[in-house]
Amino acid sequence: MAPKVVDRRNTMPQLQAKSLEMRTPQATKTAVLVIGGAEDKVHGREILRTFFGRAGASKAYITIIPSASREPAIIGGRYIRIFEEMGAEKVEILDIREREQCESSQVRASLEACSGVFLTGGDQLRLCGVLSDTPVMEIIRQRVRGGQLTLAGTSAGAAVMGHHMIAGGGSGETPNRSLVDMATGLGLIPEVIVDQHFHNRNRMGRLISAVAAHPDRLGIGIDEDTCAVFERDGWLQVLGKGSVTIVDPTELTHTNEPHVGANEPLTVHNLRLHILSYGDRFHLYQRTVLPAVHRISS
């Protein structure tokens, strides 16, 4: 009797997929969703639905903070309609325009009770000016750290996530010191510097410029309608239509950033670059990259 021959050519992809699934981190209950702006608000709304689900789905109590916007009532109202249509139990706007409002017992009570906070787009400097070093920010920070709150920020609401924040700057130029304006962010994910509308506005040069100035931070560039979901266990996962660019200076060997004029080109040696798309994962501390499971094919 002839020995049975096993064709392993078709089994290898399945074995690879199973192995990858075993290594793939599972979603934690709460997370921080950092959105590159212009997220889909009309059709599938995948990113907003993910936030809604992480905030409790039909039991969600969502608080919208539109402080970055010049039209907070209008933009806040739009998100209220979206999350009410999804079926949230309660949705409200905290229309905080002055720092004094952050002392309000009613505002603090809302933030102690809600399951999700959404920071809208607008001007990141305005948002930081209103919220930084206030009781509101302390409640959000403590509840996020404790796994009691899901937080999302889009556009300006994404830019504020790091301790070092890109406040403005140019696009599409050779990296140089004058290309990026830095300020202090809210420090919710202090290890990163976030840029948004990333490839849509050709912002690679300014993110590299920011990382050259702060080589102890990880640069995260997020495209429009794209989200980096930061899990509590250190994993980042990509959702949406675009990509997340990671500029990792861990192995940086040289930069002339401290020594050149503001408009002179920067030298930055030995940066590591990752371009991640839907389903890809990156570990914030281990610097490990995992591809999306569905990418493995025969």
From Swiss-Prot:
Keywords carried by this UniProt record: Hydrolase, Protease, Serine protease
Database matches in InterPro entries: Class_I_gatase-like (IPR029062), Peptidase_S51 (IPR005320), Peptidase_S51_cyanophycinase (IPR011811)
Reaction(s) catalysed (UniProt annotation): [L-4-(L-arginin-2-N-yl)aspartate](n) + H2O = [L-4-(L-arginin-2-N-yl)aspartate](n-1) + L-4-(L-arginin-2-N-yl)aspartate
Single GO term (MF): peptidyl-dipeptidase activity
Enzyme Commission number: 3.4.15.6
Cross-referenced PANTHER family: CYANOPHYCINASE
Function summary: Exopeptidase that catalyzes the hydrolytic cleavage of multi-L-arginyl-poly-L-aspartic acid (cyanophycin; a water-insoluble reserve polymer) into aspartate-arginine dipeptides.
Family: Belongs to the peptidase S51 family.
NCBIfam families the UniProt entry points to: cyanophycinase (TIGR02069)
Protein name: Cyanophycinase
UniProt source species: Trichormus variabilis (strain ATCC 29413 / PCC 7937)
